[in-house]
């Protein structure tokens, strides 16, 4: 697993990139279920290969976007799944929806650990669909389904 550490204006960001869907889903699920900070799980492509980025910003109220990390360590990464956790609220915030604006082809979601539900959203609606996510295997299945949908569109 390649690790990257970047700083933004308010705190340190801790993110890592891997080619292993299992490792990414396992670490993200463990972090979300066992901490009170927001986590990010992103799946996509870099240099034509499937990649997964996970991380947190050590804050309970926000997590950095990949573009918000100094020195842009994930340059060239093309996301198809962009999920982050909300420890205390369901659905996307206005800020989440603003971050989704203009990013076509990406499935955005907020995971709420209290009810183990993923809330899909876009730049217009904070709750398009709700999907139960009882384990890391559910997260992996969701991700693989989105990879397949993306491959069919190309």
Pin down the residues of each PLM region.
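Glycine-rich short-loop/terminal segments
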Residues: 1-79, 124-154
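A detector of repeated loop/turn-to-beta-strand junctions in beta-rich toroidal repeat architectures
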Residues: 39, 103-105, 115
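Structural recognition of the beta-strand scaffold that forms the well-ordered cores
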Residues: 41-42, 80-84, 107-110
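Extracytoplasmic/secreted cell-surface and envelope-processing proteins
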Residues: 52, 90-94, 117-121
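Short His-Asn-centered micro-motif
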Residues: 55-56, 83-87, 100-101, 110-114
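Active-site-adjacent loop/helix micro-motif of nuclease/hydrolase catalytic cores
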Residues: 64, 89-98
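Histidine-centered catalytic micro-motifs
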Residues: 78-92
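Sequence context surrounding c-type heme c attachment/ligation sites in exported
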Residues: 105-111, 118-120
